[in-house]
Amino acid sequence: MEISIPTTLGLAVIIFIIFKLLTRTTSKKNLLPEPWRLPIIGHMHHLIGTMPHRGVMELARKHGSLMHLQLGEVSTIVVSSPRWAKEVLTTYDITFANRPETLTGEIVAYHNTDIVLAPYGEYWRQLRKLCTLELLSNKKVKSFQSLREEECWNLVKDIRSTGQGSPINLSENIFKMIATILSRAAFGKGIKDQMKFTELVKEILRLTGGFDVADIFPSKKLLHHLSGKRAKLTNIHNKLDNLINNIIAEHPGNRTSSSQETLLDVLLRLKESAEFPLTADNVKAVILDMFGAGTDTSSATIEWAISELIRCPRAMEKVQTELRQALNGKERIQEEDLQELNYLKLVIKETLRLHPPLPLVMPRECREPCVLGGYDIPSKTKLIVNVFAINRDPEYWKDAETFMPERFENSPITVMGSEYEYLPFGAGRRMCPGAALGLANVELPLAHILYYFNWKLPNGKTFEDLDMTESFGATVQRKTELLLVPTDFQTLTAST
């Protein structure tokens, strides 16, 4: 019996529909909840016009704290609650210990050989050990105390030099100070082209935020070129590479003691001794890590702390009173003076709760298929932990959107990721290794800014007028620079 073409097509359509229904029923049994999606771009349209961390938080409130997003070609799971954060960062920590490959990592981080982006494995484990024992140990962080104190003092003098009643760009001054601290820690004092180096790093940080087309469509190499990002990153990287090569070539070796060693000294010593298989590019990748990540995160945290204090005069008065009573007119602040300043530490904790420097932490990647909460998670799935949402979860935080340092009084919660409702530096194996250095670079500068000066908004504005709009880059910064008028409080008698 001959079958007509229309009949054949009809049968084909029926078979196709039945097949799709059957496979949909089968495949979706173990898939995570998700918003509605579009072809090709997946769920990206839900995030247009939003800050990524806020957009993802709003989606999670509708679809659950364990949710799937298809970001272009990249299958992504988003965790937005302490419960699921603890699960993926403890029980499944090794499973999600990898990093997804990115265009920035390929070009800027010397093919992902830095600490942050290196794939999980022996090389990364050795780097982590190097950080723990050498580069970012408590002893090494302590060894940079004198330069922190010196650069904080220089900041005070710079602010004083502007004269009374004149607004200053505090954002610019803070970034410059942190960059100088880290530059001296990394390379020593008086390197050539420090400002050029800092500006290039700043440009990379600006280019690496959000969901980039090159990273959500990794297989579409043509898009990487059409977007212009590959060319921009390559250009900046080449300039940075030349600068670092010159710094290394001119760097004096043979420090007389380990306490005098810069971060570059440590890396070159280990490279030359063959204690660790470091290449010249590995050394440069790690140095860029320390400088880039540290500058942006510390300066942003200080800015947000001051912004929140300006908007909360009660807390500003309380922290300044604590500082001024404890120091009792002391001319120069030392880090030892801050050990018992409890409210200052609460202010920093609360700032990190509301404004974690990396609100989506650093994405991880699933190393092997697993089952999470009864859902099938394929290998290579990207993991985002939205610490911004977790830190503002109303189930765990009363008045979660309010700046209230007192919430941490008599609280066992620390910044080191042991309590999963508060994760400013992440948690688990891939937690930020520079937390101790970052905190040291926040606490002392903030103390100087608050101890020596009173602050107000320019042009008669009140605290309600302060713009708190965010800008998403490598970290979440203020969109507008922080312009404030200093009023001298603590009179200085020394000129040095």
From Swiss-Prot:
Keywords, comma-separated and alphabetical: Heme, Iron, Membrane, Metal-binding, Monooxygenase, Oxidoreductase, Transmembrane, Transmembrane helix
Gene Ontology CC: membrane
Residues reported to bind heme: 432
Transmembrane segments: 3-23
Membrane topology value: Single-pass membrane protein
Single Gene Ontology MF annotation: heme binding
Enzyme class, spelled out: oxidoreductase
Source taxon at top rank: Eukaryota
Protein location: Membrane
Described function: Valencene oxidase, which preferentially hydroylates the C2 position of (+)-valencene in the trans-orientation, producing trans-nootkatol that can be further oxidized to (+)-nootkatone. Can also catalyze the three-step conversion of germacrene A to germacra-1(10),4,11(13)-trien-12-oic acid and the partial conversion of the non-natural substrate amorpha-4,11-diene into artemisinic alcohol and artemisinic aldehyde.
Family: Belongs to the cytochrome P450 family.
UniProt name for this protein: Cytochrome P450 71AV8
Organism per entry: Cichorium intybus
Gene this protein is translated from: CYP71AV8
